[in-house]
C-alpha cells in the first residue's frame, strides 16, 4: 500500500531535485 505521506515525500523530493537541477543548469550556462 502507498501512503499519502509517501506520495507527499516523493513529490517533495522530485520538486527539490528539479530546483537543484535548474540551478545547476543556470550556473553551467553562465
From Swiss-Prot:
InterPro entries: PSI_PsaM (IPR010010), PSI_PsaM_sf (IPR037279). GO terms for cellular component: chloroplast thylakoid membrane; photosystem I. The chain crosses the membrane at residues 7-26. It is a single-pass membrane protein. Pfam families: PsaM. It comes from the Eukaryota. GO terms for biological process: photosynthesis. It is found in: Plastid, Chloroplast thylakoid membrane. NCBIfam families: PS_I_psaM. This is Photosystem I reaction center subunit XII. The lineage of its organism: Eukaryota, Rhodophyta, Bangiophyceae, Bangiales, Bangiaceae.
Amino acid at each position: 500500500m502507498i501512503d499519502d505521506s509517501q506520495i507527499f515525500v516523493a513529490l517533495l523530493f522530485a520538486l527539490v531535485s528539479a530546483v537543484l537541477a535548474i540551478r545547476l543548469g543556470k550556473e553551467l550556462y553562465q
